[in-house]
From Swiss-Prot:
Residues 292-307 have a biased composition (Pro residues). It comes from Methylorubrum extorquens (strain CM4 / NCIMB 13688) (Methylobacterium extorquens). Its EC number is 2.1.3.15. This is Acetyl-coenzyme A carboxylase carboxyl transferase subunit beta. InterPro entries: AcCoA_carboxyl_beta, Acetyl_CoA_COase_Trfase_b_su, ClpP/crotonase-like_dom_sf, COA_CT_N. Belongs to the AccD/PCCB family. Its main location: cytoplasm. GO terms for cellular component: acetate CoA-transferase complex.
């Protein structure tokens, strides 16, 4: 015997649900990794991607960083040179060119660097920001060229050079051509130093691998955001190698500050003011010749070719 249909639950209720259904955006809420607290996405975005209450610093896009730093959120994009897209014809599970296409569609950027020129606290400044969303901010030929172009812009305009580092390291799909960018960027930093221009590095979460082993640790001043992972090899790799449990907070910004690897841990909301003050002081000092210092070189040393 077939039971009579419950028309209220099977007919009326679904229609009511359909009538009053509201589309909920997938990114309406953001969950705090520390506390599990759910916060409106818009509220977190307006707070520069810092969770209110817990003060957990989430990852931030390169464009958002430039907007946060430059006065009135406006700047001039520094044109970046083009490089060969796939010099080694590399393929793993996917072709490298396909990975690049996906990353460009996802971020709207040609590669993992964005360079801007503008004013910060009325002081002219050149800022480079790495985009972790683009293949984990990995350093390849395009990234190396971008960093060097940023340094050249700072040299040309006589401004401080500020870097927001966020990277998983060298880009394996470019092999030795990626590793070549480590000495190239180091030479660019030397040119800034020879010209007596400040180079400030802000270490964000995460800054690892070949980036840590090169330009991210060559600043005149090293700032870090709270809780940022800063290392060459990650804690999981080290634990598997030495078969020991690492101390709590190992390789985090606060740990490195205690051990002299970082000068200051700065909340994201205070970064603009801190960097503006530091660069202002350093530019004033470096305009005044110090006794016993060598004169500025008139011809900077050339950079090696990218490939």
């Amino acid at each position: 015997m077939v039971e009579p249909m419950n028309w209220i639950s099977e007919v009326v209720r679904p229609r009511i649900k359909t009538l009053f259904k509201r589309e909920t955006p997938e990114n309406l809420w953001v969950k705090c990794p520390d506390t599990g607290q759910m916060v409106f996405h818009k509220e977190v975005e307006q707070n520069h991607w810092v969770i209110p209450g817990s003060e957990h610093h989430l990852k931030m896009s390169a464009t958002a960083r430039l907007k946060m730093m430059f006065d009135e959120g406006t700047w001039i994009d520094v044109p970046l040179p083009e490089v060969p897209a796939d010099p080694l014809k590399f393929r793993d599970e996917k072709r490298y060119v396909d990975r690049l296409k996906e990353a460009r569609a996802k971020t709207g950027m040609p590669d993992a660097f964005k360079i801007g020129f503008g004013r910060v606290g009325s002081l002219p400044m050149t800022i480079a920001a790495q985009e972790f969303g683009f293949m984990a901010g990995s350093l390849g030929m395009a990234g190396g060229e971008a960093f060097v172009r940023g340094a050249e812009t700072a040299l040309e305009k006589r401004t401080p050079y500020v870097l927001f580092a966020a990277s998983g390291g060298a880009r394996m799909q470019e092999g030795i051509l990626s590793l070549m960018q480590m000495p190239r960027t180091t030479v660019a930093v030397r040119r800034l130093r020879a010209a007596r221009l400040p180079y400030i590095v802000v270490l964000t979460n995460p800054t690892t691998g070949g980036v840590t082993a090169s330009y991210a640790m060559l600043g005149d001043v090293h700032l870090a955001e709270p809780g940022a992972l800063i290392c060459f090899a990650g804690p999981r790799v080290i634990e598997q190698t030495i078969r020991e449990k690492l101390p709590d907070g190992f390789q985090r910004a606060e740990y490195l500050r205690e051990h002299g690897m970082v000068d200051q841990v700065v909340h994201r909301h205070q970064l603009k003011e801190t960097i503006s003050r530091l660069c202002g002081l350093l530019m004033d000092v470096r305009r005044t010749p110090q006794p016993g210092t060598a004169p500025e070189p008139t011809t900077p040393e050339p950079l090696p070719n990218a490939a």
